[in-house]
Amino acid sequence: MNETIETQMLDALELFHYAHRFRQHQFVLVLDDGARLEQLMLDIRVLYSSHIKIVILYRADQSIGDCLDRWGQRGFRFHHLASQSPEQALEVLDRDRDWEEVAVIGLDLSSDQEAEALTRQSLQIAKALGAAKVFFLGEQKGLSLGDRFLSHPRPDELEGYLNQGTPLNMVPSRLWIMIAEARRSGIEIVILEAKSGTLFEEIFTHRGSGTLLTEDYPNEIRLGREGDLTDLLMLIRHEMQQGSILPISEESIAANIQNYFVYTVNAAIVASATLVDYGDSAELAKFCTLPRYQGKGRARQLAIQMIERAAELKKDYVFALSVNPKMWDFFLGLGFEETSREELSQSWQAQYDFSRPSRAFKKSVANGKVAC
């Protein structure tokens, strides 16, 4: 099969996978200062075509009428309600939830602190609608601490920054409102730049785009199961494209899925790795973590679970290989020692491409030695 066509089909599979996951979910889009609806229209049309329910909220003094008229003439209909109080907006939305158009509501906010009022009222409306996600679209890519971008900060982490007076690129009072509502209602809040493609990347790809604020979801490590196949394929595929891990077919993943260890956050797979049996030893392989969830110790927890499992299986040692210098430090930090690839299992050597510039690491687990 032509590789380009296969890549296109996998891209389509990823899109349909996420579209199916969010089908009939309610999303609320909030236009902050600097957000232009025109720049978001292609994203909104993709969401609408994916049968995601959309409500767009904006301050009534923002001018978006020309954009709505232009797209209405092109056949994309909006249900537009200008200059509504939050109470009126809720009444209309609650009464007419079955309309097929995208609802666009201008909120009349009689407050000196309009940014805070827009944040608070938008979240209250989203909660009343049972929305799954609220997207605040503005001039910033997301939250940042100096040059450090915060893709998925924990609520307690953000509270620490705010209590210490650490400068972030958002008015603290708005951020406090968001943290409180995420914890209280469980709504996922996304802070995102209002430009074409950002909503699509945030919703329909593994990468994400902005900053995601959530409550402290339950985390779990478990073994893979058949229903995980597409999630694992999407997760592993991008690491293969970058050359970080060796290619593996969907059939191979399916055949060995019970040997995959997956890390879930609120039941969604965010990281994975697999334990491959080689008789007296086992390989820790295929480490993958969604970009938003990297750097938070999840891969380490997966590795520890696999090392413990290898010890339970009475293996003499575990080993791992990587071409990535960050992974070299990762394995050394787990108590592995660098070794020659020729010192590893003969059955592993028989199927390995030694032209690959990988480095090998080994750790004894004989007699139950699993300390990391």
Segments the model singles out, each with a brief description of its role:
Residues 1-247, 251-252, 295:
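C-terminal catalytic "cap/lid" subdomain
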Residues 243-291:
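A conserved beta-strand-loop-helix scaffold within acyl/acetyltransferase catalytic domains
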Residues 289, 295-310:
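Conserved acetyl-CoA-binding loop-helix of GNAT-fold acetyltransferases
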Residues 310-323:
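Conserved GNAT acetyl-CoA-binding A-motif
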Residues 319-321, 332, 337-356, 360:
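Conserved catalytic-core motifs of GNAT/GCN5-like acyltransferases
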Residues 354-372:
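Acidic/histidine-enriched, glycine/proline-rich intrinsically disordered or flexible terminal extensions
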